[in-house]
């Protein structure tokens, strides 16, 4: 796993950020998913042939195993009703052109795991499934059993617009609508910075808004400067700053042990430092080309002549 994958995974595990992503996706930013009602789950998805798990609960050798990025259980309370669901996030720093298939596998494995778990409970409790039909006994899944719904969200941590397929049908070699009508489709849920408007960004309530906004404008210096200047919320937790640093290659200084980072100030200092280095290199070039006297260059750089001479000695010719 690369560094960017590691930091995005750590960031999205935060319940506040995780809930914010799904509140945006499902409820348009309304605070319905409560971070306090989220519980971390094992991200290992194992597909089992239904009803064949042995008495010791050991998966058979032909079991398929995959790993999600983040998976949490949630209790959604709305209008005096409560729903128990599973929420999964897949972080993508690069565009994945088979994402619909990948997500189908994750969701199918989770449903397969639920069926296997339910079947195992029935066997442990009922033994021979007395009072149930042969079909219920063979499948291990009873007529009244229900599955917990799974919603998987793809979060693109990249500045380029996602140009990969958003559905299984888009991936098919056949595009005949008559045939596709009988091919099951699967749509992915995607948050893509490049496609979000300023109004969309305003629907996020956590630092995810600043992270996604920074990524969105990271290739446009002028728009990024406007975003940073007009945003009073750029005092971010360290994990959010690490995501910005990793996925946009912004050389932010994040001191070890720091809990919050003033990203606006850090970027401003970085840009000022970059401008100062550029001006200093230009002065060195002018002196070397004979267009400016050493004493005058030192004065412009606010240095002594000796200090400027040291700078010249340590500045390679190819750097100016």
Each language-model region and where it sits:
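Elongated, amphipathic alpha-helical interaction scaffolds
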Residues: 1-320
């Amino acid at each position: 796993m690369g560094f960017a994958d590691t930091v995005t995974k750590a960031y999205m595990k935060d319940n506040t950020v995780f809930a914010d992503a799904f509140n945006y996706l499902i409820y348009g930013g309304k605070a319905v998913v409560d971070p306090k009602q989220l519980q971390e789950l094992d991200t290992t998805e194992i597909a089992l042939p239904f009803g064949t798990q042995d008495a010791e609960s050991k998966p058979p050798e032909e079991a398929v195993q995959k790993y999600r990025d983040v998976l949490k259980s949630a209790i959604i309370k709305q209008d005096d009703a409560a729903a128990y669901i599973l929420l999964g996030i897949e972080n993508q720093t690069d565009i994945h052109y088979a994402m619909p298939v990948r997500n189908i596998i994750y969701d199918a494995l989770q449903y397969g795991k639920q069926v296997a778990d339910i079947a195992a409970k029935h066997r442990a409790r009922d033994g021979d499934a007395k009072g149930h039909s042969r079909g219920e006994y063979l499948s291990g899944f009873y007529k009244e059993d229900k599955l917990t719904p799974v919603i998987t969200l793809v979060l693109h941590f990249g500045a380029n617009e996602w140009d990969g397929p958003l559905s299984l049908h888009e991936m098919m070699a056949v595009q005949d609508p008559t045939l596709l009508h009988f091919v099951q489709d699967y749509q992915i849920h995607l948050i893509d910075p490049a496609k979000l408007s300023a109004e969309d960004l305003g629907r996020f309530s956590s630092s995810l808004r600043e992270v996604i906004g920074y990524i969105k404008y990271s290739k446009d210096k002028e728009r990024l400067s406007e975003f940073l200047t007009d945003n009073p919320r750029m005092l971010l937790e360290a994990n959010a700053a690490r995501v910005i640093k990793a996925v946009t290659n912004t050389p932010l200084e994040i001191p070890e042990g720091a809990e919050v980072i003033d990203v606006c100030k850090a970027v401003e200092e970085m840009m000022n430092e970059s401008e100062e280095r550029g001006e200093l290199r230009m002065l060195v070039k002018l002196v070397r080309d004979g267009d400016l006297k050493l004493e005058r260059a030192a004065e412009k750089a606010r240095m002594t002549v000796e200090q400027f001479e040291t700078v010249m000695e340590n500045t390679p010719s190819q750097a100016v």
